[in-house]
Amino acid sequence: MKSNAPVDRNFDDLTEKFKRKVYGGLKGEIRLAVIWRDLNQVMALKVMGKPIRILDIGGGLGQLSTKLSLMGHQVSYNDISSSKMIEAQKLAKKNDQLNNIDWYNCPYQDLSPEILGRFDLVMWHAVIEWLADPDKLIEALTQLKAKNGVISLTFYNQNSLIYRNLLKGNFKLLEREFNADPGSLTPHTPFLPESVLLWIKANNLEILKSSGIRVFFDYISSLRGGHLNDVDLISKELEYSEVDPFKSLGRYIHYVLK
């Protein structure tokens, strides 16, 4: 019997669009720059350059997995999408890291700490908003985290979505429940930070680092001045991603948790 229960989103049908739209331009560069900055700060404090065990869940095109493997870390990559994993393996092979990364093409629920062990860093970036049961995620990540390990989590920020619609005059959209186009890469479940913080607290975790991702880029209606210089634009995104109130308007929020 076919179940009518909601299932986690698999991007096998949209991998090329994901590759082009999400990481084919500045949006993806800004996202990676903020996450990489935050992780480097925490990793430098925790491991002092020593190799650590890393689990990249929902690892997508594998940019972070490959980069961390090149640094000598022990990386395990996971994604429910086989087509995404193929793209990630292409990138790893190009950088001579294919055989240095462990590959798991399965739902995250199949990742067992009894089989895989526990990890010093568990990464989960921009996937919680695609889950059927997002409230169960942080507990699962905590089970995979080593005692003194950290979790890197990003989520689609509902406050950003509200603010963007206010700027565009889409007032009617704010009066009804948000529904994303099934063929769109816009997540169907944005979250208020307060909701995510409740799950964090329920699992006895603390926030070591918080940042906004794309705190102004997504609100630009026309590029001008410093917007036309990619290096300067990313530099300003990095600068204000850590500063209130700007970071609270990031399209995504990044938490590093312990």
PLM regions: where:
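A conserved beta-strand element that flanks and buttresses the S-adenosyl-L-methionine
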Residues: 123
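Conserved class I S-adenosyl-L-methionine
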Residues: 1-60, 63, 67, 95, 150-177
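Acceptor-substrate binding/catalytic loop of class I
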Residues: 180-195
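A short glycine-rich, Lys/Arg-flanked "PGG" loop and its adjoining helix->strand segment in the class I
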Residues: 135-150
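A C-terminal cap/extension of S-adenosyl-L-methionine-dependent methyltransferases
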Residues: 209-258
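Class I SAM-dependent methyltransferase SAM/SAH-binding core
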Residues: 63-110
